[in-house]
């Protein structure tokens, strides 16, 4: 599969070279970055992490200041933290388990929301790093994606709700099946033992996990204090009062726990999402919105602690600011998509 993804990467190399100008041409880290982002696109979080950690180690080798994040690290982390996901397999699985009539009805809203958060993350980092976003390759790539997403919004917005559910499900299932078959066929053509390759990667991932445990303990303790202090409940009630006071719809406020927890803890946000679906129903507005939020961005502080901690980076520069801006954009887009589709 790595060689197959490498073939796809070669087609996107002009875009990568613009976003990561400090990485030498044909350096192995480009393949690791692309494989990590590809795994995230497929919703394979556990598979993406070892690839991402390997990419960080390779980026650290290129980094002249071993304690401060390089420009390439910041760009990579912000894209990662934006949670770019094409097929939210886990979320659809939870929705099915909790009795959703159509577990994949959130597929398209999630894709639109996560595209928004990723685009904001890239633009924010480009501005900070003074990367010219008007370069031809970037305009063609992101302009094409924007037109594709905009076209989908227009198409599905003109359909009845039953048609939206039918065609979004068909699109997701067809795409997933095609990708899986593509990996298998690519492996057979190149005589790669995919299972053995997976086992070797798992061994490396286990060794890395031992290295990062202290950093994870620190971030999880901080999350626990925030939850136990009641600060989250205070924020939610304040937002509800503010929204109601200006006469706006407050239905989305019940999904705020998932939005607030998402940048801090993936398991915490997942628990908030499941709690919302159990309380209000998997097919309720709140249940669907919580699912969209869960898929629209990633756990920023967890990703930063995990990835930077694995290579000993202490100065993260503006990574957190840009990633949180992307999280905010993803949350706003998730709310907009929920009102649009449901």
State the predicted function of each range.
Residues 35-44, 84-87, 124-134, 159-167, ...:
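Juxtamembrane/interfacial segments around transmembrane helices
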Residues 93-227, 244-246, 318-342:
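Signature of multi-pass transmembrane helix bundles
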Residues 48, 55-96, 100-130, 256-342:
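C-terminal transmembrane helix pair
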Residues 1-5, 9:
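Single conserved hydrophobic/aromatic residue that forms the stacking wall/gate
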Residues 16-52, 217-235, 240-276:
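Hydrophobic alpha-helical transmembrane segments of multi-pass integral membrane proteins
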Residues 18-31, 62-70, 168-175, 206-214, ...:
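Membrane-interfacial loop-to-helix junctions in multi-pass transporters
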Residues 11, 29-30, 47, 51, ...:
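Juxtamembrane loop-helix boundary motifs flanking transmembrane segments in multi-pass membrane proteins
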């Amino acid at each position: 599969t790595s060689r197959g993804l490498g073939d796809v990467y070669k087609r996107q190399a002009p875009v990568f070279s613009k976003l990561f100008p400090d990485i030498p041409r044909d350096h192995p880290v480009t393949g690791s970055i692309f494989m990590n982002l590809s795994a995230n696109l497929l919703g394979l979080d556990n598979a993406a992490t070892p690839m991402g950690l390997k990419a960080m180690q390779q980026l650290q080798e290129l980094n002249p200041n071993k304690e401060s994040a390089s420009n390439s690290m910041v760009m990579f982390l912000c894209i990662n933290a934006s949670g770019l996901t094409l097929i939210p397999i886990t979320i659809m699985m939870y929705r099915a388990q909790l009795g959703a009539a159509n577990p994949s009805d959130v597929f398209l809203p999630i894709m639109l929301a996560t595209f928004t958060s990723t685009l904001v993350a890239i633009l924010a980092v480009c501005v900070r790093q003074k990367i010219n976003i008007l370069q031809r390759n970037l305009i063609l790539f992101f302009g094409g994606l924007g037109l594709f997403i905009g076209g989908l919004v227009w198409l599905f917005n003109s359909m009845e709700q039953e048609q939206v559910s039918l065609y979004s499900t068909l699109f997701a299932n067809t795409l997933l099946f095609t990708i899986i078959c593509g990996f298998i066929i690519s492996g057979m053509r190149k005589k790669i033992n995919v299972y053995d390759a997976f086992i070797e990667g798992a061994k490396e991932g286990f060794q890395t996990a031992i290295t990062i445990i202290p950093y994870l303990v620190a971030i999880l303790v901080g999350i626990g204090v925030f939850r136990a202090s009641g600060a989250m409940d205070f924020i939610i009630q304040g937002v509800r009062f503010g929204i109601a006071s200006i006469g706006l719809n407050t239905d989305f406020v019940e999904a705020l726990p998932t939005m607030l927890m998402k940048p801090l803890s993936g398991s915490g946000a997942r628990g908030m999402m499941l709690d919302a679906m159990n309380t209000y129903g998997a097919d309720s507005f709140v249940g669907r919105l919580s699912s969209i939020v869960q898929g629209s961005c990633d756990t920023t502080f967890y990703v930063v602690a995990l990835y930077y901690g694995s290579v000993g980076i202490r100065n993260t520069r503006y990574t957190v600011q840009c990633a949180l801006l992307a999280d905010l954009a993803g949350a706003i887009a998730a709310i907009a998509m929920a009102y649009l589709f449901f």
